Amino acid sequence: MNYKDAGVNIDEGNKLVEMIKPIAKKTLTDNVLEGIGGFAALFEIKNYKNPVIVSSTDGVGTKLKIAFMMDKHDTVGIDLVAMCVNDIIVTGAKPLFFLDYFATGKLKSEVAVEVIKGIAEGCKIAGCALIGGETAELPGFYKEGEYDLAGFCVGIVEKEELIDTKSIKEGDAIIGLASSGIHSNGYSLVRKVFFEKNNFSVKDFIPELGMNLGDALLTPTKIYVKSIEALKELKIKGMAHITGGGFIDNIPRILRKSIAAKINKGSWKIPTIFNLIQRLGDIEEREMYRTFNMGIGMVVIVDPSDVDKALEKLNGIGEKAYVIGEIVESEGGVIL
């Protein structure tokens, strides 16, 4: 008996590594001192006076179930990168490098390489290097054809350039940056609504969406790195990545208890997919705002005097941005 008899194919793993190398190489920067395949990756920090390292880890959640149903694996890697780098940039940091963890019951290189291509694409969009990862073949641990993903990102910022959310005060403006869709949160509810309660198939064409349901649900999470870079000349007082917990749980994470975010509903167009979920699932409005991004994937808080400049900068790079509310004196939280 050998390891392959037990369900672990080392040769398949080595084959995948060779397939990954040229993909990852396209993301590398001059700071990366060694290529893919070593025991550890080396990254040189240059031109910083008082650097602060910022880290984040995340996954894609049950959005992966949609990828399995569609047998489409080239976009969930973008989601993985987005979930990590969008958390990094709210501190004022820029992403430096990324690592991934791919685990499956039986390794299929053709599937894994599609996932890695998506991760590499996400890294290119975010301007960070894919410097390593782990592929784990775990017989009997996952259902056939399924896998799980985790991502790890490290960024950097000068200490004096860290965003200080303590400066947020009454009257400050809340700018919302448009999402690309559902992003990567709320998919357990999404699947319940569409597939269990209403018996949809991922292949069903949805006239309101103009596409098949599966394609709409797999729309990759938007990466906001370049959008936030466009605002670097302005004083950003705070940012919130609208992920699990939606508006209700994420915006208060950057607010003192004596102030609240007053959101002006109707100041942006809520994408059709959310209206569909709410109607088909008979979901209360506040629950929608606590589960989904509702069309706003990133919130930026600035002084009112900086609003016009911020919108000009964002619109100039093709970013859809809206003034969606203001900071008010209150017991904290979000006022809809």
Curated annotation (Swiss-Prot):
Record InterPro entries: PurM-like_C_dom, PurM-like_C_sf, PurM-like_N, PurM-like_N_sf, PurM_cligase
Gene Ontology annotations of biological process type: 'de novo' IMP biosynthetic process; adenine biosynthetic process
Enzyme Commission number, as recorded: 6.3.3.1
Keywords: ATP-binding, Cytoplasm, Ligase, Nucleotide-binding, Purine biosynthesis
Protein location: Cytoplasm
Keyword hit for Cytoplasm: yes
One Pfam family in the UniProt entry: AIRS
Intrachain S-S bonds: none
GO molecular function: ATP binding; phosphoribosylamine-glycine ligase activity; phosphoribosylformylglycinamidine cyclo-ligase activity
UniProt similarity note: Belongs to the AIR synthase family.
PANTHER family referenced in this protein's UniProt entry, alphabetically: TRIFUNCTIONAL PURINE BIOSYNTHETIC PROTEIN ADENOSINE-3 (PTHR10520:SF12), TRIFUNCTIONAL PURINE BIOSYNTHETIC PROTEIN ADENOSINE-3-RELATED (PTHR10520)
The protein, known as: Phosphoribosylformylglycinamidine cyclo-ligase
Upper classification of the organism: Bacteria, Bacillati, Bacillota, Clostridia, Thermoanaerobacterales
Gene: purM
